[in-house]
Curated annotation (Swiss-Prot):
Protein name, entry field: ATP-dependent protease subunit HslV
UniProt-listed InterPro entries: ATP-dep_Prtase_HsIV_su (IPR022281), Ntn_hydrolases_N (IPR029055), Proteasome_sua/b (IPR001353), Proteasome_suB-type (IPR023333)
GO BP term, example: proteolysis involved in protein catabolic process
Organism name: Vibrio parahaemolyticus serotype O3:K6 (strain RIMD 2210633)
Quaternary organization: A double ring-shaped homohexamer of HslV is capped on each side by a ring-shaped HslU homohexamer. The assembly of the HslU/HslV complex is dependent on binding of ATP.
GO molecular function: metal ion binding; threonine-type endopeptidase activity
Gene giving rise to this polypeptide: hslV
Record-listed Na(+) binding positions: G157, C160, T163
Main subcellular location of this protein, as a coarse class: cytoplasm
GO cellular component: HslUV protease complex; proteasome core complex
Subcellular locations according to the entry: Cytoplasm
């Protein structure tokens, strides 16, 4: 699989991912681009799961963004509806992490759209490691979003055999800050 992480901090949002493509227990490619810019570079998207499935979802998601003039949440919900109702899409095995200047969302293979706590997303085989690392860095450092995403991916890559250290990082200016959790 892979690891994708998204962090929002100090008016920046980042989605970063590793580049490993595995077939069973064999590394087939180490420099795949699993993070992309969509809709006139205003939306970031990263995928975890089957590569062909993810490209199909990228195309569908981008068409939904076009249809809804770049409205991220509306496009995500419409894609999720299609994913649930379309027999061909239902068989796709992938997760999407998407973000624009105001929102960060996870679109699941079950057709769910989730807005994560604190605008922190970590998906894929190394997602739990990346999420734990990013959470600790968000709570205990002043690092920026890009540094946190890169460090979280490095930690996931050190632990998860399906995650490597070849990263693609995309960044946008953000107009919102995640809520600080109550003590």
């Amino acid at each position: 699989m892979t690891t994708i992480v998204s962090v929002r901090r100090n008016n920046k949002v980042v989605i970063a991912g590793d580049g490993q493509v595995s077939l069973g227990n064999t590394v087939m490619k180490g420099n795949a681009r699993k993070v992309r810019r969509l809709y006139n570079n205003k939306v970031l998207a990263g995928f975890a799961g089957g590569t062909a499935d993810a490209f199909t979802l990228f195309e569908r998601f981008e068409s939904k963004l076009q249809m809804h003039q770049g409205h991220l949440t509306k496009a995500a919900v419409e894609l999720a509806k299609d994913w649930r109702s379309d027999r061909a899409l239902r068989k796709l095995e992938a997760l999407l992490a998407v973000a624009d200047e105001t929102a960060s969302l996870i679109i699941t293979g079950n057709g769910d759209v989730v807005q994560p706590e604190n605008d922190l997303i970590a998906i894929g085989s190394g997602g739990a490691y990346a999420q734990a690392a990013a959470t600790a860095l968000l709570e205990n450092t002043d690092l920026d979003a890009r540094e946190i995403a890169e460090k979280a991916l490095n930690i996931a890559g050190d632990i998860c055999v399906f995650t490597n250290h070849h990263h693609t990082v995309e960044e946008l200016d953000s107009t919102t800050e995640p809520e600080t959790p109550a003590a």
